[in-house]
Amino acid sequence: MATYVFIDQNIPLVYTVETGVITKGFGDLLFVDVSPIEEQIKKLETLVDAYEHSLDPRYPPLNSFPNRDGVYAISGYFKSAFFGFWIGLGIMALLAIILGVKF
């Protein structure tokens, strides 16, 4: 069974999902240039791939210099060290206040 998508109700345009053909109503064929849409879809696919790869630290960012593999992993180490330092310092300060250590 064919699946149809109505594009416009005023002008009876129908898109057939299985064949990818846009027809006028259910009769004559209407030819449409879809190459600009395909170019935009390709750009969107590259951005989606870059977004998916940003979740994996083994891949470089989309617009980066060559040999930048592992930049996300390195930034993960620095972020962990940064927050670990400040959280540890805060815990030590709380313990010093609770124990009544005089400076």
Curated annotation (Swiss-Prot):
Alphabetical GO biological process terms: methanogenesis, from carbon dioxide; methylation; one-carbon metabolic process
Molecular-function GO terms, alphabetical: tetrahydromethanopterin S-methyltransferase activity
UniProt catalytic activity: 5-methyl-5,6,7,8-tetrahydromethanopterin + coenzyme M + 2 Na(+)(in) = 5,6,7,8-tetrahydromethanopterin + methyl-coenzyme M + 2 Na(+)(out)
Pathway(s) per entry: One-carbon metabolism; methanogenesis from CO(2); methyl-coenzyme M from 5,10-methylene-5,6,7,8-tetrahydromethanopterin: step 2/2
InterPro entries per the UniProt record, alphabetical: MtrB_MeTrfase
EC numbers: 7.2.1.4
Compartments (UniProt record): Cell membrane
Transmembrane segments annotated in the record for this chain: 81-101
Family recorded in the similarity comment: Belongs to the MtrB family.
Function comment: Part of a complex that catalyzes the formation of methyl-coenzyme M and tetrahydromethanopterin from coenzyme M and methyl-tetrahydromethanopterin. This is an energy-conserving, sodium-ion translocating step.
Protein name, entry field: Tetrahydromethanopterin S-methyltransferase subunit B
Gene label: mtrB
